[in-house]
């Protein structure tokens, strides 16, 4: 402790000194705990009222929700955009108040200052004081092979998240910035929990997560299938099990379809993931808004040679210029694609048909891998709001006993069973709620409960 303080005091920037001192004290409290520390009182279940601040820190954004865990009610939510390049915060309360303003946010710490002000001051005020925030839960995209469940933040956890940045450079670096900014903004008495998108997929067997490249690349660099959208797949699959009357998951076979601008399909047996479409990165799987999905690896090297592209340029092409956008030439937004299809745009039709065909192949393969399927789940922006795509998928599997209820399938963003009562396989639209999963995990961990 003394050596740390001496080192810090040599730094001339006062702000850095304060941050480092807070951080050191925070880590000591996390490691040892004290009877009078409110954070540890939370963890011991001594708090009756609990409000959780859920954070999703991106490279230039910070999304948040404040959730009152008594009734699991969202008190307010918002988004800080264009961090480092100007700034805008949009803050919405549960009773309909909306506050939007341009404000300079040069880093995530400045963004947190705006979040604090939005929650406690002015027209968007929902709490009287920051002391009402019991804990903070962070969404983390990449947790590697190490994390198969959510954990309390400590020094090693932060370092591990930073170390996995090579597998998710745009995300994990921002997550670390978000955690450190939260420590600065809320002090050391507010415990923090991290919830990993990859954790739910850690039950996959090696035959599903290994790639057919030399084994040493797995040993040396962690090259394997990790899967993403795990928090979403976890929420909707657990909700589906409740609807099936089998909350423990035993004897069940589910296929969860998270369709958004980024999309993935996951096979779940007995409540545990056995396979998923995304791989080392969120680029794998079927064609998405601007992502290529799986392609012959030789296509990559061939284009690089022909175009003289660097690895970074090729990565940008596959992630930002491909998929529905690249094929249609119209947009990466599914609503624009649907409108273009309706207007007779042939390339938009091709993009639509390619994606649908690829999805159907994955679902069919997962039915075989599961040895059958009890229920199909549709979630996320497209899955919850695109009846035509859902209908096309279900009709394809009529031979397997899926029967679409045309009227119920017209639903947008509302939990609904969209198959008929005599369908041998049930299909549901289940709106996802990743923030609630993060809040629930955060509450459980600081109360000392097992996940």
Stretches with model-predicted labels:
Residues 387, 391-434:
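Conserved phosphate-binding/catalytic loops in two-lobed NTP-binding clefts
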Residues 119-171, 191-193, 199-208:
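Short beta-strand-loop/turn "lid" adjacent to the catalytic site in phosphate-handling enzymes
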Residues 61-105:
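Short glycine-rich, Thr/Ser-proximal phosphate-binding strand/loop in the N-terminal lobe
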Residues 118-133, 240-248, 363-374:
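Phosphate/pyrophosphate-binding loops at sites that engage ATP/ADP/AMP, CoA/4′-phosphopantetheine
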Residues 323-327, 334-369:
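Adenine-nucleotide phosphate-binding core of ATP-dependent small-molecule kinases
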Residues 200-304:
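Glycine-rich phosphate-binding loop of actin/hexokinase-like ATP-binding domains
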Residues 49-53:
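Extreme N-terminal starter segment of soluble prokaryotic enzymes
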Residues 260, 374-397:
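Glycine-rich phosphate-binding loops at beta-strand->alpha-helix junctions
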């Amino acid at each position: 402790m003394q050596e740390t303080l001496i080192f810090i005091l040599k730094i001339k920037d006062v702000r850095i000194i304060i941050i480092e001192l807070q951080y050191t004290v925070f880590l000591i409290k996390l490691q040892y705990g004290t009877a009078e520390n409110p954070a540890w009182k939370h963890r011991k279940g001594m708090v009756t009222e609990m409000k959780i601040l859920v954070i999703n820190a991106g490279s230039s954004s910070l999304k948040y929700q404040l959730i009152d865990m008594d009734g699991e009610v969202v008190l307010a939510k918002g988004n800080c955009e264009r961090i480092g390049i100007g700034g805008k915060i949009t803050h919405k309360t549960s009773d309909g108040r909306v506050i939007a303003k341009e404000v300079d946010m040069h880093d995530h710490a400045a963004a947190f200052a705006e979040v604090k002000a939005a929650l406690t001051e002015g027209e968007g005020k929902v709490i009287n004081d920051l002391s009402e925030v019991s804990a903070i839960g962070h969404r983390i995209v990449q947790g590697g092979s190490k994390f198969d469940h959510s954990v309390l933040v400590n020094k090693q956890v932060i370092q591990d998240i930073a170390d996995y940045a090579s597998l998710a450079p745009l995300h994990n670096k921002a997550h670390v910035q978000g955690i450190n900014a939260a420590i600065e903004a809320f002090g050391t008495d507010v415990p923090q929990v991290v919830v990993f998108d990859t954790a739910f997929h850690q039950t996959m067997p090696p035959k599903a997560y290994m790639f057919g490249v030399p084994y040493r690349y797995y040993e040396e660099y962690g090259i394997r299938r990790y899967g993403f959208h795990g928090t979403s797949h976890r929420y909707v699959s657990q909700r589906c099990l409740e609807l099936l009357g089998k909350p423990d998951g035993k004897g069940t076979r589910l296929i969860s379809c998270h369709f958004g601008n980024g999309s993935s399909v996951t096979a779940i047996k007995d409540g545990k993931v056995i396979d998923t479409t995304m791989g080392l990165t969120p680029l794998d799987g079927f064609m998405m808004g601007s992502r290529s999905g799986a392609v012959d690896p030789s296509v990559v090297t061939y284009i690089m040679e022909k175009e003289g592209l660097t690895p970074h340029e090729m990565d940008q092409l596959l992630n930002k210029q491909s998929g529905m956008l690249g094929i249609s030439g119209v947009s990466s937004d599914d609503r624009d694609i649907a409108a273009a299809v309706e207007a007779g745009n042939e390339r938009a039709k091709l993009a639509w048909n390619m994606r649908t065909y690829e999805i159907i192949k994955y679902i069919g393969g997962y039915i075989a891998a599961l040895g059958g399927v009890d229920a199909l789940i549709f979630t996320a922006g497209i899955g919850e709001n695109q009846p035509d795509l859902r209908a096309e998928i279900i009709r394809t599997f009529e031979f397997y006993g899926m029967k679409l209820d045309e009227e119920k399938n017209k639903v947008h963003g509302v939990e609904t069973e969209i198959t008929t009562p005599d369908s041998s396989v049930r299909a549901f639209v289940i709106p996802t709620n990743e923030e609630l999963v993060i809040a629930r995990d955060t509450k459980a961990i600081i109360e000392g409960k097992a996940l």
